[in-house]
UniProtKB/Swiss-Prot annotation:
GO biological process terms held by the UniProt record: thiamine biosynthetic process; thiamine diphosphate biosynthetic process
NCBIfam families for this protein: thiE
Catalysed transformations (reactions): 2-[(2R,5Z)-2-carboxy-4-methylthiazol-5(2H)-ylidene]ethyl phosphate + 4-amino-2-methyl-5-(diphosphooxymethyl)pyrimidine + 2 H(+) = thiamine phosphate + CO2 + diphosphate; 2-(2-carboxy-4-methylthiazol-5-yl)ethyl phosphate + 4-amino-2-methyl-5-(diphosphooxymethyl)pyrimidine + 2 H(+) = thiamine phosphate + CO2 + diphosphate; 4-methyl-5-(2-phosphooxyethyl)-thiazole + 4-amino-2-methyl-5-(diphosphooxymethyl)pyrimidine + H(+) = thiamine phosphate + diphosphate
Binding site residues for 2-[(2R,5Z)-2-carboxy-4-methylthiazol-5(2H)-ylidene]ethyl phosphate: 135-137, 165, 185-186
GO molecular function terms noted in the UniProt entry: magnesium ion binding; thiamine-phosphate diphosphorylase activity
Protein residues bound to Mg(2+): 71, 90
Database matches in Pfam families: TMP-TENI
Keywords in alphabetical order: Magnesium, Metal-binding, Thiamine biosynthesis, Transferase
GO cellular component term, pick one: cytoplasm
Cofactor(s) demanded: Mg(2+)
Descriptive protein name: Thiamine-phosphate synthase
General function of this protein: Condenses 4-methyl-5-(beta-hydroxyethyl)thiazole monophosphate (THZ-P) and 2-methyl-4-amino-5-hydroxymethyl pyrimidine pyrophosphate (HMP-PP) to form thiamine monophosphate (TMP).
Gene it is expressed from: thiE
Higher taxonomy: Bacteria, Bacillati, Bacillota, Clostridia, Eubacteriales
CDD domains recorded: TMP_TenI
Length: 207
């Protein structure tokens, strides 16, 4: 198996955690093997977001990890992030592609095959698929069936990252065979030992 074939562990930050604490937790996750970090901040001022994103980008650069910003293309551009992740209610992928640098990574959250096909056609580089399990991070998350996940996999030629309530204990073979990695928040950031929890995830993803 080549490096590009390894399933990836993707951390999404939690804006409810004080930033200095979040920075330290993110570092532990990166040491543990996280290879993608998405900065997600709600109800924060742009100046504060830019400051935080800049520090996280610097940290990700130290570990050779990809750094993405959720929703806010302006913040992503300001801190020279590697890309953005956008949802169904955000800017169209095609417009984001025009604004972002040519080599920028654009991820999109999708919930069904139709949304996946549209995102791929418009130039998405990866898809966040879910929610696979119930989650406290997004109140309005609708659970995705295994059948829907398989439908998306069947039409996708770009990486798929599972999202929503994922832990090392609820991932099974049927789910994993349709994913290229998983994106997590609470399962890592609420762990007593983030570094070891990251390694635990990667061990499961490597099977």
């Amino acid at each position: 198996m080549s490096n590009k074939d390894y399933k990836k562990l993707y951390l999404v930050t939690d804006y409810r955690i004080p930033f200095n604490e979040l920075l330290e937790k993110t570092k532990e996750a990166l040491i543990g093997g996280v290879s993608i970090v998405q900065y997600r901040a709600k109800n924060k001022k742009t100046k504060e977001m830019c400051k935080e994103a800049k520090e996280l980008k610097k940290l990700c650069d130290e570990f050779g990890a990809l750094f993405l910003v959720n929703d806010r293309i302006d913040v992503a551009l300001a801190v020279k992030a590697n890309g953005v992740h956008i949802g169904q209610d955000d800017m169209e992928v095609s417009i984001a592609r025009e604004i972002m640098p040519k080599d920028a990574v654009i991820g999109v959250t999708v919930h069904n095959k139709e949304e996946a096909l549209k995102a791929i056609k418009e130039g998405a580089d990866n898809l966040g698929v879910g929610a696979l399990f119930s989650t406290n991070s997004k109140d309005d998350a609708t659970l995705m069936t295994l059948e829907t996940l398989r439908e998306i996999k069947s039409v996708s030629n770009i990486p798929l990252y599972g999202i929503g309530g994922i832990t090392p204990y609820n991932l099974n073979k049927d789910i994993l065979e349709n994913l290229d990695g998983v994106a997590v928040i609470s399962a890592l950031l609420n762990s007593d030992n983030i570094r070891e929890k990251s390694k635990e995830f990667l061990n499961i993803l490597s099977k």
